[in-house]
Amino acid sequence: MTREEVFERVRDYLATELAVDAGEIGDGTRFKDDLNADSLHLVELLVELEDSYGIRIPDDEAAKMETVGAVVDFVAAHVPEKAS
């Protein structure tokens, strides 16, 4: 699983769930400030990623994730090679 594949999955999920244009979502996009996402949206995204990739995202790490890039970096670094 490449970082780009993780990014595309996160971008597509957010575009669908938050009804925003996928083209507006980049690494520096902030969940609250740019996407008007609340904490529930972020929790739902993280649970989706945990379930999809078979990883755990500790609460203390999740609390630091303010941008799309931060989530993508964490997931990409912790996904086993053959995860899809």
Residue ranges: model-predicted function:
Residues 1-41, 47, 51-84:
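Phosphopantetheine-dependent thiolation modules in NRPS/PKS and related acyl-activating systems
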